[in-house]
């Protein structure tokens, strides 16, 4: 058995996009997490670093996201890491890594 659990706290980068799959609501949005700049023990400067994460929310979570989450909202997120591959119109393969949200809390709203 193995577990892939992701816990993030960050800022929403864009308003959720809502679509329906077999009449189930699905929200897609981005979340930025930032490691602050710091100085190492030997004096080396390490710059600030921001990572962007693709979030996917289903059903009730998607409905809540559509109603309450906007760009700039600070979220606490727990979920599973999923990677999928898809092919575009030009038959070019793309790979995307997403967080399938299992639990979240809105820490502040914009």
Name each model feature, range by range.
Residues 1-110:
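Single-stranded nucleic acid-binding surfaces, predominantly the OB-fold ssDNA-binding core
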